[in-house]
């Protein structure tokens, strides 16, 4: 997924989700202050996206509806969205990834409906994801920073490497 970076960090009993603000169209930067992370379900769930903006908003709406249906149960809502994503002909064409988290779980929901919960409590998606992931793992292992501080610094490192990621970073924490 070209054009963004989103990272989620679970550390010291907290969870933080951070995303950059850059939106690109081909080789052109179209927007610098997009909001790619948001709070859902009574501010108890964090979600971020990488990929097509229109597709991501469709998935946010679907995921939020699943959260309502399953009373904020993140895992159940993710599994049900994954099932629908795999079986619905329209949804299968959507090009986006979601990273979602609550106080207990952190999940990546992929475009083919797969759901992955990382072992180390760190997940990153988008073109700058590998850089942010590596930075966050190092910061968790070698600093006493908070989850929010780690997410922000990992995003800054990714933005210094990935041309599709800027340093207009929004961090949400639970």
UniProtKB/Swiss-Prot annotation:
SUPFAM superfamilies: N-terminal nucleophile aminohydrolases (Ntn hydrolases). It is found in: Cytoplasm. Its main location: cytoplasm. InterPro entries: ATP-dep_Prtase_HsIV_su (IPR022281), Ntn_hydrolases_N (IPR029055), Proteasome_sua/b (IPR001353), Proteasome_suB-type (IPR023333). GO terms for biological process: proteolysis involved in protein catabolic process. It catalyses: ATP-dependent cleavage of peptide bonds with broad specificity. One of its GO terms (cellular component) is HslUV protease complex. Keywords: Allosteric enzyme, Cytoplasm, Hydrolase, Metal-binding, Protease, Sodium, Threonine protease. GO terms for molecular function: metal ion binding; threonine-type endopeptidase activity. Allosterically activated by HslU binding. Belongs to the peptidase T1B family. HslV subfamily. A double ring-shaped homohexamer of HslV is capped on each side by a ring-shaped HslU homohexamer. The assembly of the HslU/HslV complex is dependent on binding of ATP. Protease subunit of a proteasome-like degradation complex believed to be a general protein degrading machinery. This is ATP-dependent protease subunit HslV. The gene is hslV.
């Amino acid at each position: 997924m070209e054009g963004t970076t989103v990272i989620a960090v679970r550390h010291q009993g907290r969870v933080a989700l951070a995303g950059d603000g850059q939106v690109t169209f081909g080789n052109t930067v179209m927007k610098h202050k997009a909001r790619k992370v948001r709070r859902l379900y009574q501010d108890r769930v964090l979600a971020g996206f990488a990929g097509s903006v229109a597709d991501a908003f469709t998935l946010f709406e679907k995921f939020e509806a699943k959260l309502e249906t399953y009373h904020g149960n993140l895992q159940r809502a993710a599994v049900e969205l994954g099932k629908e994503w795999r079986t619905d002909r329209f949804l299968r064409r959507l090009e986006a990834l979601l990273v979602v988290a609550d106080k207990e779980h952190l999940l990546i929901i992929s475009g083919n409906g797969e759901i992955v919960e990382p072992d180390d409590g760190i997940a990153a998606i988008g073109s700058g994801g590998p850089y942010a992931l590596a930075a966050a793992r190092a910061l968790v292992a070698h600093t006493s920073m908070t989850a929010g501080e780690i997410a922000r610094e990992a995003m800054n490192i990714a933005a210094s490497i990935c041309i599709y990621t800027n340093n207009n970073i929004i961090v949400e924490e639970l």
